[in-house]
Amino acid sequence: VAMMLWRSGPMGDLKLIYTPTAIIIAQVVISFPVVTGLTAAALQALDPRLKLQLYGLGASRLQMIWMLWKEARLPLLAALMAGFGSVISEVGASMMVGGNIRHQTRVLTTAIVLETGKGNFDIAIALGILLLTITFLVNWALTWIQQRGAQR
């Protein structure tokens, strides 16, 4: 991703390197294979008779896609959680394409690395606790949604 966004790279004319947009692009590239693989597995695990049943009931293509996604919602939430986990803990790509520029492209993970390198372990630990808290709350909310959906 970094080589594509560098000034001499194929997307260099867009001047995206060291911007928040570059960080977003890098995070999408990192999480895409995880989310795509788990989503494909979730959809393939559906009972093949469900598609035939929906056809038999006269469902349109859009209605069928909606029902299949709805039926696979719990594994899809697991895919979302896995993608979030890979993105929230990532440091390298954010540092390379974002540059860790104060007030512009510094994110929690790169700030933790910076503060640890400067010897400010108290700040690094506080940022780490904040990152863990955010991660815990997001995963708790998604797990709650999954469990609520499983009861239906």
Regions found by a protein language model. Name each.
Residues 1-28, 98-101:
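Membrane-interfacial helix termini and adjacent extracytoplasmic/periplasmic loops
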Residues 16-40, 70-75, 82-89, 135:
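Faces of alpha-helical transmembrane segments in polytopic inner-membrane proteins
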